[in-house]
Amino acid sequence: MSDGGAGAKGAGFGMPRVGMGTAVQGPRPEPIRRAVLKAIEAGYRHFDTAAHYETEAPIGEAAAEAVRSGAIASRADLFITSKLWCSDAHRDRVLPALRQTLWNLQMEYVDLYLVHWPVSMKPGRYKAPFTADDFVPFDMRAVWEAMEECHRLGLAKAIGVCNFSCKKLDTLLSFATIPPAVNQVEVNPVWQQRKLRELCREKGVQICAYSPLGASGTHWGSDSVMASAVLRDIAQSKGKTVAQVCLRWVYEQGDCLIVKSFDEARMRENLDIVGWELTEEERQRIAGIPQRKINRALRFVSDHGPYKSLDDLWDGEI
């Protein structure tokens, strides 16, 4: 990926290095629409959504409004990522699910379409809580072949995965005709993903970091990132915020990153991660932060499902 701010393009498929996340708890179409318009004004060009988030429609509305107002010249100025939900992770449901996403967005294509989790559920199960009977085996090959068809049809300019362990990514790469362009995973200073990053670099798969600030305030998030004494000390010494230090650290790893704020001042603050860098000593201090995965995804673990433990889900990599 090339250097630069929110509009910087990646070498392979044009993914800006900094994207705005839109995962929210409960439908909030109007706040999302307004926030996306503010983000476009601030300089964001990459917007991350998913069928599960129920934010595709307001993103599409904001994009159309931004074109009409002249804030952007055309849809092509934006990079839109969306994701296939688990209940549509079946060979015959992938293409219809993407068509529904495109209808929601009122767009002809998405720039990146991702398998949200290496998990399949019974069709129609979109809302938590999920029950043990909802989970069915994940047919990775069948799902990926359907994803490849979405790409061949031009409905997804690039395809990829989310939350794939090293083992699952290796398995996918062993048979994929079109390799995944991206693995979107949790990355932050308390979960640095060194092993996965090395594999992705070797295989040419771009890491896109979600929850770079720890997702504090969500039902599964943690304040362990923002409360880190190491990060606070570095931020104070550099005259930056803890959030900026975290985002700069992710940026320096070569990752794309997804960060969410609906506050305009913080949107701009989160873009201010270029033009300065961490020192080698600061990088080493961050490298020494104790590691613990925040998003463990216990909701996908069931005695009666394919993943009976966290070790099964993450292949012993957490």
Curated annotation (Swiss-Prot):
Q: Please state how the activity of this protein depends on pH.
A: Optimum pH is 8-9.
Asked whether the UniProt record includes Cytoplasm among its keywords, one would answer no
One of the entry's Gene Ontology molecular-function terms is: aldose reductase (NADPH) activity
Among PROSITE patterns, the record links this protein to: ALDOKETO_REDUCTASE_1, ALDOKETO_REDUCTASE_2, ALDOKETO_REDUCTASE_3
Which residues of the sequence carry a binding annotation for NADP(+)?
A: 48, 162-163, 184, 262-270, 277-285
Q: Which SUPFAM superfamilies would you find in this protein's record?
A: NAD(P)-linked oxidoreductase (SSF51430)
Keywords recorded for this protein, A-Z: Iron, NADP, Oxidoreductase
Q: What is this protein called?
A: Deoxymugineic acid synthase 1
Gene expressing this chain = DMAS1
